[in-house]
Every structure is written in structure tokens, then in C-alpha cells.
């Protein structure tokens, strides 16, 4: 019992004095966590598209994308979100600072420049954030984010679930948004 108490004390103390992550560690962790999230969402999406088609997959995403994201965040001890300027889910709207980065990347694409794999930025509040571009890189993305016929059942389902949807009209290679990982 006493040993347990001493151990607990050390454990709590080590948490309190834990060294902040180095830049290298943040890059490594950010890359790891964002890859996990993309894989997790991608696998679910693929399964749902194959078994139920785009409308079922749409409903699955609207009900589970955020909780799957939270799960990855919890497991990694970070905060993660996906944001976009042309967002579908209002929760995923980019902030002012995030828009500035997305606009910068948008301009790079326009100039046929290659996007960085990630960007690490120290915010004015002292926190460092890892950003990773999300590009439309699969035909499957266009099913729900491309040109969708206005009178199709899918268009209706999108409109019902997301009356403010802005996330259609994308083409292959377009910047769709980014993953934001905060430490
Ligand atoms: C079955 C339809 C469907 C497909 C296919 C699909 N998405 Fe989405 N997407 C959604 C829905 C619904 C949301 C909103 C719910 C959420 O994920 O938070 C969304 C949201 C997003 C967001 C978050 C920003 C926002 O607009 O809310 C990104 C980024 C995104 N999708 C990228 C992609 C990419 C990249 C692909 C291809 C790999 C893809 N999506 C394929 C339906 C789809």
C-alpha cells in the first residue's frame, strides 16, 4: 500500500514536470496521429460505401466522423480536428488563422507548387500546432465532394443533413482542408 502511494506520487510528479515535446517529437507525433486518423476514417468510409452506398456512408460520416476523431485524439493525448474553408459540417469551419494557412496553400497550388507535407506553427499563445493538408486524392472523394447532380437522392440527403453545405464542386488534386493537431 505504501509502495503504491509512493509510486503514485512519483507518477503524478513526473506528469507535472514532464518536458514539453521537442519540435522533432511534435512533427513525429503529428504525422503519426494524422496518418492514423486518415486511415481510420478512410477504412470506415470504404466499408460503408461498399456495403451501403454513398447515402449510407454519408450518414455514417455525419454520425461517426467526429467521435472517431476524438477517439484518435484521446489515444494519442493530443487535440485533433479536420477543418476546411468550404466546410460541410459547421463544426469543421476553419478559424481565421487556419484560413490564412489554407489560403496560402491554395495560392501554392494555383502556382503549380508542391504543398508541404506538414507545417509546424507556434501560435501567439505559446502552443505549437501541426497542420497537414488534405487533398482530394481519390475518385471516391468526388462521390460526395465533387459535382453532384442537384436532383439526385445524394444531393437531397446532403442538403437535409447539412443545409449550409459548401463542400461540393471539388476536382481531383484540389485542397479540401487540413488536419490540425495541437499538443
Ligand atoms: C459518403 C460521402 C463522403 C465521401 C465519399 C467523402 N466524404 Fe468527406 N465528408 C462527408 C461528410 C458527411 C462530412 C461531414 C462530417 C464529418 O466528416 O465531419 C465530410 C467532411 C469532410 C472533411 C471535413 C471538413 C468538412 O467539410 O466538414 C474533409 C476534410 C473531408 N470530408 C475530406 C474528404 C476526402 C479527402 C475524401 C476522400 C478520401 C472524402 N472526404 C470522401 C462525406 C463524404
Predicted regions: what they are:
Residues 2-10:
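Sec-dependent signal peptide recognition
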Residues 10-18:
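Hydrophobic h-region of N-terminal signal peptides that target proteins for export
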Residues 143:
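Short, cysteine/histidine-rich loop/knuckle motifs that typically chelate Zn2+
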Amino acid at each position: 500500500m505504501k509502495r503504491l502511494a509512493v509510486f503514485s506520487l512519483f507518477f503524478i510528479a513526473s506528469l507535472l514536470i514532464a518536458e514539453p515535446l521537442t519540435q522533432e517529437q511534435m512533427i513525429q507525433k503529428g504525422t503519426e496521429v494524422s496518418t492514423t486518423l486518415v486511415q481510420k476514417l478512410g477504412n470506415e468510409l470504404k466499408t460503408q460505401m461498399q456495403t451501403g452506398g454513398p447515402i449510407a456512408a454519408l450518414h455514417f460520416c455525419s454520425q461517426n466522423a467526429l467521435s472517431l476523431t476524438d477517439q484518435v485524439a484521446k489515444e494519442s493525448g493530443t487535440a485533433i480536428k479536420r477543418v476546411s474553408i468550404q466546410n460541410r459540417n459547421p463544426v469543421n469551419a476553419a478559424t481565421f488563422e487556419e484560413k490564412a494557412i489554407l489560403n496560402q496553400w491554395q495560392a501554392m497550388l494555383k502556382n503549380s507548387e508542391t504543398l508541404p507535407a506538414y507545417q509546424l506553427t507556434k501560435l501567439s499563445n505559446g502552443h505549437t500546432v501541426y497542420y497537414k493538408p488534405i487533398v482530394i486524392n481519390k475518385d471516391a472523394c468526388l462521390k460526395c465532394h465533387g459535382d453532384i447532380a442537384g436532383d439526385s437522392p445524394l444531393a437531397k440527403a446532403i442538403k437535409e443533413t447539412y443545409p449550409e453545405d459548401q463542400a461540393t464542386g471539388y476536382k481531383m488534386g484540389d485542397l479540401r482542408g487540413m488536419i490540425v493537431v495541437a499538443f
